[in-house]
Design a protein with these regions (language model features):
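A short small-residue
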Residues: 144-162, 201-202, 278-286, 333-340
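Non-catalytic accessory regions flanking glycosidase/transglycosidase catalytic cores in CAZymes
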Residues: 21-195, 212-242, 267, 271-272, ...
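Noncatalytic carbohydrate-binding groove/subsite architecture in carbohydrate-active enzymes
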Residues: 211-371, 380, 384, 425-429
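Bacterial Sec-dependent N-terminal signal peptides
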Residues: 1-22
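Active-site rim elements
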Residues: 343-347, 389-397
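Conserved radical SAM core fold
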Residues: 51, 80-83, 135, 199-205, ...
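Short, conserved phosphate-binding/catalytic loop or strand-edge motifs used
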Residues: 194-200, 323
């Protein structure tokens, strides 16, 4: 009996390996448009606003701006937090609001201006977060300043800046003065292109009040924004994952307030709501000594959030911004203290990003919502150890592999077109059970524009373990040209990967100037082979490429 069972296992193993040994196929049909390639990826954010105007912060922002053909939106916490502007992990401050001995307001926009000037100089746009509570306005100000250290309990950061104001009218005047100052400094047309938002994750300890107190604060804030600039855009509430009861219920209550309830300021029904925002995070963990990602958790948050917004007929066409959209929830928790975050330096992060963004678009199509943007909550951490494992796009001025996925996205525009593949997981399968089968998700996202087309490919699996490279047979159908120029780009262990180069150097803690130059070069998006001009036969091209596990490729066509 044991021998029979063993034989069955062997047969099943050989059958599964035989299935995987088949070539992966991807077929792109450029005549089948499925939606717009909305640049939802061109949104970024971070906790520490003072990094914005520091050396590596400015360098990275310049690179992000350069990779995008459209203005990039940037969201930062702590824009109204009290302090001297000294940066720290999960902390930042601007001292925008203080009071004199008689309780009169003192406005100082010096640091806020440094932050926004840095964006505007690069053609970027603020997703301007109204928060957090200045010390002089907090209803429970002490203690105020926190000193977060990786490995420390996350709850230690929730201090006096989380609480409602002791005077809502003073708060409203602060918001009014900020928007008015912004218009005076940058011009009405520029500020009309921004998005103003209130707070962050108010269903969590980030907000020390109730849901109704948040709605009250929103009404005061929205009224102040619109008094300063009637054409300004304001939204919220940036709750945590809507698939969870806490986030989902808060989102529903807030949307009901904005569409059906009495406004705390005007006494009328409803409140301005130019966009809806919620957050979505994955959930990596350690399994048998390796990192196992969970993309499904993140996609369920997105799907549920879309569904909740779509359930309000008044919000049918309202833009949706996923205000934080990431593989997990703590950017400042490195892999030394949180080993499940060891995916961040290499190709797991880049392949996850490619595969997950494609599913965000698919879920938006499914729910028929206006998907505007998805903020990648990842930036840089100034003067920290090399490749410490923070969730960042660069380390000490050197780009990580994940940034090159966004460089690829920057070359995709126009309409998304149909992609089918024999190893490509359906979007709902990834949402419901992530990528856990014996075979990887070998998929694609394709676009077509005037005179150009692009196909992004990935070889992704939740398990961060070594695997077989895939041979991918790529069929491109209904190409509207006789001849095309084809260029390929690649992110894997040998291409566009500063982390692997750093490890080959011996993982230096203080690289030399020569090594840094080499790392900077390795951090750029690399071509895969030479560009070539090819004749299209009957509107079709067929060619094969090899894609390593966790590899991401981009094929561009020009005619």
């Amino acid at each position: 009996m044991k021998n029979i069972s063993f034989a069955r296992i062997v047969i099943l193993w050989f059958c599964s390996m035989a299935g995987w040994a088949q070539k992966a196929t991807l077929t792109v049909d450029f005549s089948k448009e499925i939606g717009s390639m909305q640049p939802a990826w061109a949104w970024f954010g971070y906790d520490e606003p003072n990094y914005t105007y520091m050396k590596d912060g400015k360098k990275l922002l310049s690179e992000i701006a350069a990779l995008s053909p459209v203005p990039v939106y940037v969201r930062a916490h702590n824009l109204l937090t009290t302090g001297d502007g000294t940066p720290a992990l999960k902390w930042g401050s601007t001292n925008a609001y203080t009071e004199d001995a008689q309780g009169n307001p003192i406005y100082d926009w010096t640091i806020v201006d440094k932050i926004f000037d840095t964006y505007i100089e690069r053609g970027m746009k603020p997703l301007a977060q109204i928060g957090f509570m200045p010390e002089a306005l907090s209803s429970k100000p002490e203690p105020y300043r926190h000193h977060f250290v990786p490995g420390q309990s996350y709850t230690t950061i929730f201090t006096g800046w989380t609480y409602p104001p002791k005077d809502y009218k003073k708060w409203a005047e602060l918001v009014y003065q900020w928007v008015k100052h912004s218009v005076a400094r940058y011009g009405q047309k520029e500020v009309e292109s921004w998005y103003w938002e209130l707070w962050n994750e108010p269903d969590s300890p980030y907000w020390g009040g109730t849901v109704q107190e948040y709605c009250k604060l929103y009404d005061y804030s929205a009224d102040a924004v619109r008094r300063a600039l009637p054409t300004a855009k304001i939204g919220g509430p940036h709750v945590t994952g809507p698939a969870g009861r806490r986030g989902g219920n808060f989102l529903k209550t807030f949307l009901k307030h904005c569409t059906q309830d009495t406004n705390y300021v005007t006494g009328k029904i409803g409140a301005p709501l130019d966009f809806v925002a919620f957050h979505a995070k994955g959930a990596p963990k350690l399994v048998n000594g390796h990192v196992q990602m969970n993309m499904g958790t993140q996609l369920r948050d997105i799907s549920t959030g879309f569904e909740i917004v779509a359930s309000f007929p008044q919000l049918k066409n309202t833009p949706i911004i996923i205000g934080e959209s990431d593989p997990e929830g703590c950017a400042a928790c490195g892999m030394k203290t949180d080993p499940q975050n060891a995916y961040r330096n290499g190709t797991m992060y880049s392949s996850y990003t490619a595969a997950s963004f494609a599913r965000k678009y698919a879920l938006a199509d499914l729910h028929q919502v206006n998907f505007k943007g998805a903020v990648s909550w990842s930036f840089e951490f100034e003067d920290q150890p090399w490749f410490y494992g923070f969730r960042d796009l660069a380390t000490n001025g050197v780009d990580k592999p994940v940034l090159n996925v966004f460089r690829m996205f920057g070359m995709m525009s126009g309409k998304r077109v149909d992609v089918k593949g024999n190893f490509m997981y359906p979007a709902l399968t990834v949402r419901d059970s992530s990528v856990r089968r014996s075979t990887p998700d070998i998929g694609g996202l394709a676009t077509k524009d005037e005179g150009t087309a692009a196909v992004m490919l990935w070889n992704y699996h939740d398990d961060d373990v070594a695997g077989t490279a895939a041979t991918v047979d790529l069929t491109l159908k209904n190409i509207p040209a006789q001849k095309v120029n084809i260029t390929q780009y690649r992110i894997d262990n040998e291409h566009s990967n500063s982390y692997e180069v750093w490890k080959k150097m011996g993982s230096p803690t203080n690289p030399t100037a020569e090594q840094i130059t080499e790392l900077e070069k390795a951090g750029q998006l690399a071509r895969y082979g030479e560009s070539k001009r090819q004749t299209v036969k009957d509107g079709q091209l067929i060619f094969s490429t090899t894609l390593p596990r966790q590899g991401v490729g981009l094929v561009t066509l020009e005619w």
